[in-house]
Regions:
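Secretory pathway export signals and precursors
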Residues: 4-7, 51, 243
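Active-site-adjacent loops and short helices of periplasmic peptidoglycan-processing enzymes
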Residues: 16-209, 218-219
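Domain-terminus/edge residues, biased toward the C-terminal soluble/receptor-binding domains
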Residues: 11-15, 188-189, 202-205, 209-210, ...
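Generic detector of intrinsically disordered, low-complexity, polar/charged segments
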Residues: 7-9, 48, 73, 137, ...
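Sec-dependent N-terminal signal peptides of Gram-positive bacterial secreted proteins and lipoproteins
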Residues: 1-15
Length: 325
């Protein structure tokens, strides 16, 4: 039996953001970004080329009458084996991603960076509010890209995100341009990114469907899947004076940490959380169902952390094709 719905106040609102007028059109998107020529109409009515291995939806809500969908702004469940969208709530609606942004940051870093390269943390990267999500890095610290990626995904460090962006591209603005370029290449055309950490900006937004596109590309990388499924990581690095520093970073994912239990038949691999006042509580989760099908499930703008996991368990129980043990 699933737990009861929580009455929540505080971070996040349950109402959805403004939806985009048009749903995602694979043919038009492929033409716009020159994946096919403007004259090529042979594939106009098919999902070959751009979306042949993707879950595709017409944008109509699906399954929401059997869930407590009012606790979140948007959600979706995607079966990567059957290529089906099994649950859809406002999946093309404009949402603020908070730290789920770091999925794309990691994807770009893994594509363009070298895991063994060592970066020095700048004053800009270290200058993060202590009450925000940080790895407690100091100006002048030396860490490898691989280490910074653990801090980015597990600890959700905003400082690690800036250090990665500056290490890859020289500055945050140039890295954000690269993020937008890669997002569009993946078909995530209803998104725009301003920074690598997801701190709120009116012009920093995405959709559930775009996050699915980005995340499904990221999980093809073995290093990324290693990052999202790690519960605890001990990092050793040097500070600006050459002295050894050790920290222990913990995952922010309650399923991994054992403080939340998924429904029977579901095996949680990992994922990424995100929270800001404007974004609410967000979770992108990678799991398998009892048939072994890989599942991506996403919730954005939940009204509190308890309802985020309550709603996620509803989605896993009812729409990942599993039964509770």
């Amino acid at each position: 039996m699933l737990p009861f719905l929580f009455l929540c106040t505080g971070c996040g609102q349950s109402s959805s953001e403004i939806s985009f007028t048009d749903t995602y059109d694979i043919y038009e998107t492929s033409k716009k970004y020159e994946i096919i020529s403007a004259e090529d109409t042979s594939l106009q009515n098919t999902t070959d080329f751009f979306g042949k291995d993707l879950c595709v939806s017409d944008g109509i809500d699906l399954g929401t009458d059997s869930t407590d969908s009012q606790v979140a702004g948007a959600a979706g469940v995607f079966n990567l084996n059957t290529k089906e969208v099994t649950y859809a709530q406002n999946i093309y609606g404009k949402m603020y991603p908070a730290s789920t942004t770091k999925i794309l940051t990691a994807y770009v870093a893994l594509k363009y960076g070298n895991l063994d390269d060592v970066y020095q943390v700048s004053a800009n990267a270290a200058d993060q509010a202590e009450d925000s999500s940080v790895c407690h890095l100091k100006e002048g610290d030396y860490l490898s890209l691989h280490q910074l990626l653990y801090g980015l995904i597990m600890q959700s460090g905003n400082d690690a995100a800036i250090a990665i962006a500056e290490g890859i591209s020289g500055d945050v603005e140039t890295f954000a341009e690269l993020m937008n370029q890669e997002a569009k290449a993946l078909g995530a055309v209803d998104s725009h990114f301003i920074n690598p950490n997801g701190l709120h900006d009116e012009n920093h937004y995405t959709t559930v469907y775009d996050l699915y596109l980005i995340f499904q590309a990221a999980v093809q990388n073995e290093t990324f899947t290693e990052l999202i499924q790690t519960k605890e990581y001990t990092v050793d690095y040097l500070d600006s004076a050459g002295m050894s520093v050790q920290q222990v970073w913990m995952s922010t994912n309650k399923y991994l940490m054992g403080t939340e239990k998924a429904p029977g038949g579901v095996t949680v691999i990992g994922g990424k959380t995100g929270t800001t006042n404007d974004a609410g509580y967000c979770l992108v989760l990678y799991s398998t169902n009892q048939e072994g099908d890989p599942i991506i499930s996403i919730i954005m703008k939940a009204d509190c952390r308890n309802n985020l996991y309550y709603y996620m368990n509803q989605l896993l129980y009812g729409f990942a094709n599993v039964t509770e043990n």
